[in-house]
Regions:
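RNA-contacting regions in translation and RNA-metabolism proteins
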Residues: 1-145
Length: 145
């Protein structure tokens, strides 16, 4: 079999690496430091240039009752055709109270969003030229008495 290996140029923008790193941190430092770990990971992702990110931690984190914690920042598409460009990953952390699920979603800075419209000076000039050509002044009709 032929295997190709590529270097990950920006590890903070890779969802699987971030999820695995977060799961490893939860196993190492315990479930009480989960907020610190999640916010640090969130800041690293945003500092790397992501348009938006979301981290979900599910399980027995601060107590014996299971709960889902959601940390998000920026713009992130969840549904529709544009949601296909979002990088998603899952990981599991085995902590003393129980298993914790880690889900990471990252919208990369180079993602092509179909609903995003960029307006530059050239487009503005074309619109102005088109609007000037089509404007016709109509004289109001005079009523005959």
């Amino acid at each position: 079999p032929h295997i190709e290996i590529e270097e990950i140029t920006e590890p903070d923008l890779d969802a699987q690496l971030t999820a695995d790193d977060l799961a490893l941190g939860l196993e190492r430092f315990g479930p009480l430091k989960f907020k610190v770990l999640a916010y640090r990971a969130l800041q690293r992702i945003v500092k790397a240039g992501a348009l938006g990110t979301e981290i979900r931690l599910s399980g027995k984190l601060p107590s014996s009752r299971a709960r889902t914690w959601r940390f998000s920042q920026g713009y992130l598409k969840k549904t529709g055709d544009s949601a296909k460009v979002v990088d998603r990953a899952q990981a599991r952390a085995q902590t003393k109270p129980g298993t914790v699920g880690v889900k990471v979603s990252i919208l990369r800075p180079d993602a092509k969003l179909k609903d995003k419209i960029e307006v530059n000076d050239e487009l503005i000039q074309k619109l102005k030229a088109n609007s000037e050509e089509k404007i016709e002044i109509k004289q109001p009709k005079k009523n005959k008495k």
